[in-house]
């Protein structure tokens, strides 16, 4: 009799995705982040569900309801900080996952990669709306500044912003709709992640060498299930350390001040995970130009398959490209730092140089380095 897991319509899908899936024998720990992102998403949906039971999306009571969750609800403080820091862990895993894809040429799986870029935008939109919900100073002013960027769109900009706000400023209508979207989007993300996996299982996994691994496959279970469990344990260790020892490390102190439209904070900045794009936005003096650069800083990922000029898929055997890749990583750290600094000398010029370098590396230097390496192969 054939095993039930191989014949049952539902279990068959799970079996072919997580148990009998043929996987390359040489994939490293950089391939762990897909499963970690799945764990993060489940954690965020569960903690978010319990927070939504106690949260009220009204400008008069939103801030108080978050305080109530932390003070009066059983383990409410734990759920709230797991959710807030879980978002940070989500983005850390996302950035590492994307970085892995860039380094090892995983973007050559076009459908999987493009769904991944859409997922990145969806997660960023969800995180932005979640940041608004506690209705602290940074929530209110962050929402005001970021939504106001849409007014840079010619002709329809102002109408579009007022339509999103549901009035003439960020107010009750804005908060209510942001809560509604923040609740529904994670389920859309889960569905998109399913499509991401569907496309990915059509082609099979890439591996560090970038070569085809059809001749050397091993079953996902037990080898990579055990390997993934180690990653999950490390994730739990880091997240619980963050939540239990310094839950506000990655937050903004201004968000403990209730939102006040009459008092602007000295430095308005979004969550740390947006700072690199925010720095690029601020480095262009023109509003529309800044918005376009902001969007393109992430959308440029969709161009990666078109910018791939190397004869080799992975960067494993390409030292010049490796140097440029790590320069790009350093540049992103610089942009993240600049995004959190006030707009004054010398931060302005550093941000502008880092922004130019970011686009130069991706659009010009890395493709040129790949062509150079192709010629070096002939020697």
UniProtKB/Swiss-Prot annotation:
Annotated transmembrane regions: 33-53, 77-98, 113-133, 178-198, 226-246, 288-308, 320-340, 347-367
One Pfam family cited in the UniProt record for this chain: Cytochrom_B_C
Keywords: Electron transport, Heme, Iron, Membrane, Metal-binding, Mitochondrion, Mitochondrion inner membrane, Respiratory chain, Transmembrane, Transmembrane helix, Transport, Ubiquinone
KW NAD (keyword) present: no
Residues noted as binding a ubiquinone in the record, renumbered to the chain: 201
Gene Ontology molecular functions: metal ion binding; ubiquinol-cytochrome-c reductase activity
Needed co-factor(s): heme b
Record localization: Mitochondrion inner membrane
Membrane topology: Multi-pass membrane protein
Stored InterPro entries: Cyt_b/b6_C (IPR005798), Cyt_b/b6_C_sf (IPR036150), Cyt_b/b6_N (IPR005797), Cytb/b6-like_sf (IPR027387), Cytochrome_b (IPR030689), Cytochrome_b_C_euk/bac (IPR048260), Cytochrome_b_N_euk/bac (IPR048259), Di-haem_cyt_TM (IPR016174)
Keyword match Transport: yes
GO biological process: mitochondrial electron transport, ubiquinol to cytochrome c
Additional record remark: Heme 1 (or BL or b562) is low-potential and absorbs at about 562 nm, and heme 2 (or BH or b566) is high-potential and absorbs at about 566 nm.
Similarity remark: Belongs to the cytochrome b family.
Free-text function comment from the UniProt entry: Component of the ubiquinol-cytochrome c reductase complex (complex III or cytochrome b-c1 complex) that is part of the mitochondrial respiratory chain. The b-c1 complex mediates electron transfer from ubiquinol to cytochrome c. Contributes to the generation of a proton gradient across the mitochondrial membrane that is then used for ATP synthesis.
SUBUNIT field: The cytochrome bc1 complex contains 11 subunits: 3 respiratory subunits (MT-CYB, CYC1 and UQCRFS1), 2 core proteins (UQCRC1 and UQCRC2) and 6 low-molecular weight proteins (UQCRH/QCR6, UQCRB/QCR7, UQCRQ/QCR8, UQCR10/QCR9, UQCR11/QCR10 and a cleavage product of UQCRFS1). This cytochrome bc1 complex then forms a dimer.
Official protein name in the record: Cytochrome b
Species for this entry: Urotrichus talpoides
Gene name tied to this protein: MT-CYB
